[in-house]
Amino acid sequence: MEEVSSEMEVEVQNRQLSDSSPAQNVKKFGLKNSIQTNFGSDYVFQIVPKIDWTAIAVSLSTNTVKLYSPVTGQYYGECKGHSDTVNQIAFSSDSAASPHVLHSCSSDGTIRSWDTRSFQQVSRIDTGNDQEIFSFSYGGAADNLLAGGCKEQVLLWDWRNSKQVACLEESHMDDVTQVHFVPNKPNKLLSASVDGLICLFNTEGDINDDDHLESVINVGTSIGKIGFLGDGYKKLWCLTHIETLSIWNWEDGSCEVNLEKARELASDSWTQDNVDYFVDCHCPGGEDLWVIGGTCAGTVGYFPVNYKQPGSIGTAEAILGGGHIDVVRSVLQMPGEYGGAAGLFGWTGGEDGRLCCWKSDEDATEINRSWTSSELVVKPPRNRKKNRHSPY
């Protein structure tokens, strides 16, 4: 069936989140449209933008990646080739040389690159030893390294010739869920794992565990996501699989705040159902940080985080409700220069298989109005065990 999407006019609203917004000014957002990506038990894992925001890529539990217009929801095509769960996707950050290239890693042990103009695979790196790849990052002092987080290992390749240059296997004892090169120090690589450790490596020279592991942060519980924060990217936020939130200085290993009851603090900060899980953190630049929490019924809130000791989580400053009916897996907020003209806030995807596009809407009576496109990628129902997307 041909994929189509409804287009409708939306009002332009102020969409800037502020860490000082009073509770009475909480912004609620209404649906622009909703795209059903599949029938059955298939669902959305991750949504990422092309660098110029002319497309968004969406990874699905069908082991495929589909591309859409972030403004109209128009379907562009799909990248198909992985034989197991797609764990991470990202567009190339090189706006001049390869803005159309999309990268993906999978539990099938490969990292693949796709030309999103033709939707064809253009490169493939294979671990060759039944490894799963849970995360990847491009960087290095010469911008030639590709790091992959695997089972108990961090692998590094020279992506220019697909040659493996290092296997760091003594630093972690469990699945490596995250790898990130530091944006302004591309020779520095951070890895995070189910073992509760965040490791800092220097990737210059002949890379090995003994000489290039610079420091270790012990978070103490299984790590789900990490990300950079603050001027100079010196801080690191960390979300764990038991829904705790902590902020660290990765350079000296100090913990600025550890919110062990972050989910309870967020639940107490709004009038919706209890926050059941955290989706991600939002850091648009500078020192401001929001943690994005959701309910099992599909409502999502942006909660401002005060990470000065003793730390606190404030009243939700944005609420996305009425679009999903199950756990939300990914939230993608559009920058004002790309979504503002159309009054768009961003996109969400979840375990209900829906992609929801959100518009600003100050009128509370409009919050639950939605415009639903035709069913997309119609497939016959099939019996399939629904597995949570998990690194372990």
From Swiss-Prot:
Pfam families (alphabetical): WD40
Tissue: Expressed in germinating seeds, rosettes leaves, flowers and siliques.
UniProt superkingdom: Eukaryota
Keyword Repeat appears in the UniProt entry: yes
WD repeats: 81-124, 128-167, 171-211, 323-368
Description of the deletion phenotype: Fast germination rate, fast growth rate, increased biomass accumulation and early flowering.
GO terms classed as biological process: regulation of growth; regulation of seed germination
Keyword annotations of the record: Developmental protein, Growth regulation, Repeat, WD repeat
Protein role: Involved in the control of plant growth development. Acts as negative regulator of seed germination, cell division in meristematic regions, plant growth and overall biomass accumulation. May function by regulating ribosome activities and biogenesis in plant cells.
PANTHER family: WD REPEAT-CONTAINING PROTEIN 89
UniProt name for this protein: WD repeat-containing protein GTS1
Record organism: Arabidopsis thaliana
